[in-house]
């Protein structure tokens, strides 16, 4: 083979290898989702999973560490008397979690949207719990779509709504 033909054959082989390698590259997603597996989304999901584990442990102090000092919950109603901030979150968690005798709580991640230092995490909650009550224990199920809102504070993601 002449030198020019050998050059073109080598170049064509290298081009085919490079093109083939590029074609094998793929975007990495969290299993069973269309959520990109990148450093930011990993940190966000790790934060939400810490929340889920601490709920299962009834760990009020651990949950409060995950909440921003600017936390605000409007409870989704037009009334303002059921809205609360960080201090109210302390009271809600303390009073409600001590009534929970058993808890099953799973989170299915649907979407994560990050805009600057804010992340909206769309999930499907699947859970059940047993409440201690004066009239006897009560069982409840939870199956619903939900949204957590987090903000980045000092390189950590903190909940500002949805806990």
Where are these regions (language model features)?
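Hydrophobic pocket/interface hotspot
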Residues: 51, 63, 71, 89, ...
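A short gly/proline-enriched turn/hairpin at secondary-structure junctions
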Residues: 72-83
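Short, low-complexity N-terminal intrinsically disordered segments enriched in polar/charged residues
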Residues: 24-57, 65
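Sec-dependent bacterial lipoprotein signal peptides
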Residues: 1-24
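Extracytoplasmic/secreted proteins, especially bacterial periplasmic and envelope-associated proteins
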Residues: 39, 43-46, 50, 62, ...
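Short, well-ordered alpha-helical segments enriched in acidic and aromatic residues
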Residues: 57-74
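Short beta-strand edge/turn micro-motifs at domain boundaries
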Residues: 25-33, 120-122, 138-163
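Surface-exposed, charged secondary-structure patches
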Residues: 90-135
């Amino acid at each position: 083979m002449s030198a020019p033909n050998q050059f073109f054959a080598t170049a064509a082989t290298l081009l085919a290898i490079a093109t083939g390698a590029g074609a094998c590259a793929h975007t990495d997603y969290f299993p069973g989702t269309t959520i990109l597996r990148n450093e930011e989304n990993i940190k966000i999901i790790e934060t939400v999973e810490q929340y889920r584990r601490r709920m299962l442990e009834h760990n009020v102090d651990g949950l409060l560490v995950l909440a921003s000092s600017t936390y605000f919950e409007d409870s989704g109603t037009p009334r303002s008397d059921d809205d609360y901030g960080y201090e109210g979150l302390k009271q809600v968690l303390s009073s409600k979690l001590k009534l929970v005798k058993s808890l099953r709580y799973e989170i299915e991640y649907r979407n994560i949207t990050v805009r600057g230092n804010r992340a909206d995490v769309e999930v499907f909650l699947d859970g059940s719990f047993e409440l201690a009550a004066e009239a006897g224990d009560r069982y409840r199920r939870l199956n619903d779509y939900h949204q957590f809102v987090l903000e980045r504070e000092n390189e950590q993601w903190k909940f500002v709504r949805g806990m």
